[in-house]
Amino acid sequence: MKLSLTIVSSSFLVAIAHAASVQFNLIAPSATDVKVSVNGQQVALTASDPNVPYFTGSAEVGGTEESFERSLAGITNSTFNDFYNRPVTYANLPQLPWPIENDPQWTRKGKKAEIFDDNYIPSVFFHGDDSQVQDLVKNVPKDKVTGTLTFIGSNYVHSFANVSFGIHGAGKKHNNAKQSWKWTLSGTDTMGNRNHFKLRHMEEDPTQIRERLYADILHAMGTYANETTMVRLFINGQGFGTFNMLDDITEFSYINAMFYGGNPPATLGPLFDGASGADFIYHPGNLDGYSSWKPNKDNANGEGYEAFDPLCKAWNETDYTDNTAIANFEKMFDTEHFLRFMVIEYLTAHWDGYWMGQTNDGAYRDPSDNNKWYFLDQDFDATFGVNLDVPENKDFISVSYKDFPSRYPAGVMANGLLQNADKKAKFEQYLTETVRVLFNNVTLTNRVLAIHNFLSPDLEWDRSIVQQSPGTNFGWTFEQTSQNLWQGVSAPNNNGGGAEWGLVEYIAAKSQAMAKEFNITIVSEPVGPPAANGTATSTNDGGNTHTAAGESKPASSSESSGSKIASQSVSGASRSAVSTVLLGVTALVATAIF
């Protein structure tokens, strides 16, 4: 069962010239008394659900014109869902360019779901039986807890009942104390065309940016990579920190959303999770040789890893140098997007992925595309120099992709394609153009720094939380979330954690190495996606495809089923965390009173 609150907001706003009743919306964990002060008159905000600290209320404001714009006008007269003590509610992140000219974007997913709007940090509140939740947190069993879940986005609220909530990867030997989580919605409930979500703790990465950034790049490359965004998680009223909310590619929820836009065929194809050894190597007479491909339990007719035998046999028998033979194989396997994935695996030194490690991949056979196989990629935290254990150490950035087939011979799909002159030329074209416009210390660093500045207040909150579960705690500090942008850092608890490279340091070094090898002239200003006139936009000012905090943004309708109840809009005022919250408003100016 799901309830949704959605309010349509105006697409653009200038200063209001008349008095209006404005609805204020505030997320204030631990607050017991929330008020807004309008020209000195206090108006109380209230929370309708005692388990969700989401406070709303209306107040009359005057029509004095201001020298700046506010998103309080138009149809809604409502603020965005502000989070207490966060200076920016809705950001203005620079968007990445599209390096590939032909089929530049993956369109089968439809419009990007509003829940993955990267300019806003949603808040997730799960509430379940206290004794079961305590057991889940303290003892980390594989059990699931059923309860209610509220997802608060920029200008909407989704609430769900009968949600199955638990630890992702429970029972693994080296889990972090900050666990990863997952939840599944019940029945026909969906959010953004999905019913299953994964929250990754990002503890391997002090910046908490790498995995999200990797997915950002893959989307700019026109792939069907999982969608991601940062969220705040609260369980039974307690804050558990910041997490990367993303699709789990091993679940049909991801397939339904990214391949079919929420309208899947009556019967889906088989889906597989690639564990260590998922390499596409042919095993004649030994079907168990494909056992590293773990079938989804809901595969139609229980189809298992034996499904890979015809595919791997065909690849083994293909003359890689023959374009006709490659074209015939492409009727079975999508090489186009696979090459795009491999470009980014190479550029980021994704040692825990397919090419270098033959792991953390997956595959889906699409019945709506003549049963063609699609490669899936996942788990992007071990990238951009994190835990990179190679003989060359930092000199690894200069290792050419041309050396990868001999270094990593089990990556037979990538290695075979590079034996074909046309595929090798295409790979190199994608690689060099990506470095020229995107993967460099100009465009990509511009986005990294914008993301970091936006996330920083939440990272400070996250680093202040004492996790309650058993497991590894590297002890990364708030200061290291910034320091690891520029240089390597060591885990304060001296128990692992291999952030030897700074994130920006790695991007700059790798792009310079590529520019030297291929004689690439990198752009001098950040580049954005194509504008309506077909030319690339500059994002030197922080991006021009989204509006800044304090401005209005076009509203998007709810994509999930269930009744719509209401909605919210946005504001960028500063807040302060205390048990009693008092917001000061003079006319349309929302400021914090300390």
UniProtKB/Swiss-Prot annotation:
GO cellular component terms listed in the entry, alphabetical order: plasma membrane; side of membrane
Glycan attachment sites: 77, 162, 226, 316, 441, 519, 533
Protein name (database record): Invasin CotH2
Disruption of the gene: reported phenotype: Simultaneous RNAi-mediated knockdown of CotH2 and CotH3 decreases invasion of host epithelial cells. Simultaneous RNAi-mediated knockdown of CotH2 and CotH3 decreases virulence in a mouse model of ketoacidosis. Simultaneous RNAi-mediated knockdown of CotH2 and CotH3 does not lead to sensitivity to cell wall stress (induced by Congo Red, Calcofluor White, hydrogen peroxide, sodium dodecyl sulfate, or Triton X-100).
Pfam families: CotH
Predominant localisation class: membrane
GO MF term set: host cell surface receptor binding
Biotech exploitation of the protein: Antibodies against CotH2 protects mice from mucormycosis, and thus could potentially be used to treat the disease.
Biological process (GO), any one: adhesion of symbiont to host endothelial cell
Keyword entries, A-Z: Cell membrane, Glycoprotein, GPI-anchor, Lipoprotein, Membrane, Signal, Virulence
Subunit structure as annotated in this protein's UniProt entry: Interacts with host epithelial cell surface HSPA5/BiP protein.
Ranges annotated as biased composition (Polar residues): 534-547
Region span, Disordered: 529-565
Bilayer topology annotation: Lipid-anchor; GPI-anchor
Expression induction or repression: Expressed during growth in host lung and brain, and during growth in presence of epithelial cells. Induced in presence of high free iron (at protein level). Induced during growth in high glucose (at protein level). Induced in presence of 3-hydroxybutyric acid (BHB) (at protein level).
Biased composition (Low complexity): 548-565
Protein's job: Promotes invasion of host epithelial cells by adhering to receptors on the host cell surface to facilitate endocytosis of the pathogen into host cells. Binds HSPA5/BiP protein on the cell surface of host epithelial cells.
Leader peptide range in chain numbering: 1-19
Domain of life: Eukaryota
Lipid-acceptor residues (GPI-anchor amidated serine): 571
